[in-house]
Every structure is written in C-alpha cells, then in structure tokens.
C-alpha cells in the first residue's frame, strides 16, 4: 500500500525522467541543426545561441516538430515513440492529480496512482534512452578527432 510520500516520490522520479527526455530531445534538435547548418566547420555562435533559446522556450510538441524538420528517419518508429513520450509527459504534467481526483485519500487509490506513474515512467524512460542515444551518436559523428585535440590542448575549438 502506497503512502502519500511514496506517491509523491514516484511522481518526482517520473517528472525527472520527463525532463531528461525533453533535454535529450532538445540536444538532438540542436545537434542536427548544427550539422545541417555546418556549424561544426564554420562556427556561428550567435545562430546556435538563438536556436538553443528557441528550443528551450518551446513546448515538447514543438521540439518534436523541429526534430522532424531537422532529421530524417528511415521509418516513423522513433517519431511514434517520441509522440507516445509526449502524450505520457502531458498526462503527467497536465492534470495527473486532477484525473485521479479523490484516489489520493485511500491506500487502494494511491496504489492505482503509483501504477499509473509506473507506466508513464516506463514510457518516458524508453523515450529518454532513445533520444539520449541519438544525441550521443550525433556527437560522435559530428565532433572530429581534430576538434577534440584542439580542445584538449587548450586551443579553442571555436574560431
């Protein structure tokens, strides 16, 4: 039987996972935009800063739309998964407690709420793992050995 503290802890853990997903997805969009605009060869810190600001001020749904504009996928499986993540995130942050209403007042109700949070957490966790893997793959592909050597030798990688 879940206590209120356990319920709130699970909500917090799920919220953290949602934010990790959002951050990783934003990183993928920014890295893709950098690649598409050749910022890795011809740096444009002002354009990159503007792009980051737009990403950070956007809803997750808008960031997902940006991703579809910047990066092409062979199939829709990843986009479909990210859309499920968007739905899970919105269920969490837009009315989770309202939807469950008085369930918080009983042990059985709180168990129900925790079970719902576990499902949302699992969906968001899977989305975060995919987005984080994409971000890592883009970074490995785009950051050259020469740029790494310049950075580690004390030279600025930005001209």
Regions found by a protein language model. Name each.
Residues 1-61, 77, 83-84, 132-155:
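Amphipathic alpha-helical interface elements
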Residues 123-134:
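Amphipathic alpha-helical coiled-coil segments
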Residues 105-124:
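Short secondary-structure subsegments characteristic of cysteine-rich extracellular domains
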Residues 78-102:
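Histidine-centered, metal-coordinating catalytic motifs and their short helical/loop contexts
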Residues 1-4, 65-73, 108:
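Short, charged/polar, low-complexity loop and linker segments
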Residues 29, 62-68, 97-100:
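Membrane-helix exit/interface motif
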Residues 103, 159:
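Conserved catalytic or regulatory cores that recognize and/or transform ribose-phosphate-containing ligands
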């Amino acid at each position: 039987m879940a206590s209120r503290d356990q319920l709130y802890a699970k909500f917090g853990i799920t919220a953290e996972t949602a934010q990790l997903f959002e951050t990783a997805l934003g990183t993928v969009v920014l890295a893709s935009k950098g690649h598409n605009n050749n910022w890795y060869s011809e740096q444009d810190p002002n354009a990159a800063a503007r792009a980051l600001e737009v990403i950070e001020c956007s809803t997750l749904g808008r960031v997902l739309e940006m991703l579809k504009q910047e990066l092409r996928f062979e199939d829709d499986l990843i986009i479909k998964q990210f859309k499920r993540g968007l739905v899970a995130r919105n269920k969490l942050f837009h009315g989770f407690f309202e939807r469950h209403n008085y369930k918080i007042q009983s042990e059985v109700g709180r168990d129900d709420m925790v079970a719902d949070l576990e499902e949302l957490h699992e969906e968001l966790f899977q989305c975060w793992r995919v987005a984080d893997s994409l971000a890592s793959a883009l970074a490995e592909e785009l950051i050259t050995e020469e740029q790494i050597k310049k950075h580690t030798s004390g030279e600025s990688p930005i001209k």
